[in-house]
A protein has these predicted regions:
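Generic extreme N-terminus detector
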Residues: 4-5, 41
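Polyanion-binding surface elements
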Residues: 6-33
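Short intrinsically disordered terminal tails
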Residues: 1-4, 65-70
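Major-groove DNA-recognition helix of helix-turn-helix-type DNA-binding domains
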Residues: 25-54, 61-62, 67-68
Length: 70
């Protein structure tokens, strides 16, 4: 079983971290915009695993609840 198949066992809304592509599907924000947002040094909803960006889903939810625009 590969990593993608394992990730499909747990729904996105229950995972602690999600990929950029999953975050884009989850929020409706494009991958490019999410990448731009996570490039900021003050971004607290990104977690780096080597050179891979993982999105902290709960922190992203909090950010979006308080954001006026992205």
């Amino acid at each position: 079983m590969n990593r993608e198949e394992k990730n499909n066992l747990v729904p996105v809304w229950e995972r602690a971290t999600i990929t950029l592509e999953e975050a884009a599907a989850y929020t409706g924000i494009g991958v490019r915009k999410l990448r731009e947002m996570t490039d900021e040094p003050t971004c607290d909803f990104v977690m780096w695993v080597g050179n891979r960006r993982m999105i902290k889903r709960r922190k992203l939810d909090e950010y979006l609840e308080n954001a006026y625009s992205v």
